[in-house]
């Protein structure tokens, strides 16, 4: 599990991205790069690192499910992810 401070930082970054999304879009359309530079760095969505929604793990993230491979495997074995079942042939 990730440190609680890293999870909190990630959530704070997500809020900043949402807060400035409309303003960033407008400034980009105008071509006002000077004003874009004055916005907070963390308001840029490119700086976000995808993290597991359950425990905050940053590596082995599965975008389709919003979780890491470890949590995906555990939940899939328990049958808690709809439409996912263990393969057998």
Swiss-Prot record:
One of its GO terms (cellular component) is small ribosomal subunit. InterPro entries: Ribosomal_uS14, Ribosomal_uS14_bac/plastid, Ribosomal_uS14_sf. One of its GO terms (molecular function) is structural constituent of ribosome. Keywords: Ribonucleoprotein, Ribosomal protein, RNA-binding, rRNA-binding. The keyword Transferase does not apply. The keyword Cell wall biogenesis/degradation does not apply. It comes from the Bacteria. One of its GO terms (biological process) is translation. Belongs to the universal ribosomal protein uS14 family. Part of the 30S ribosomal subunit. Contacts proteins S3 and S10. Binds 16S rRNA, required for the assembly of 30S particles and may also be responsible for determining the conformation of the 16S rRNA at the A site. PANTHER family: 30S RIBOSOMAL PROTEIN S14, SMALL RIBOSOMAL SUBUNIT PROTEIN US14M. This is Small ribosomal subunit protein uS14A.
């Amino acid at each position: 599990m990730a440190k609680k401070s890293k999870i909190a930082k990630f959530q704070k970054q997500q809020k900043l991205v949402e807060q400035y999304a409309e303003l960033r879009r407008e400034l980009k359309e105008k071509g006002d790069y000077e004003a874009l530079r004055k916005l907070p760095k963390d308001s840029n969505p490119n700086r976000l690192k995808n993290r597991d929604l359950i425990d905050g793990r940053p590596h082995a993230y599965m975008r389709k499910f919003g979780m890491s491979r470890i949590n995906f495997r555990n939940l899939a074995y328990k049958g808690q992810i709809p439409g996912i079942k263990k393969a057998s042939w």
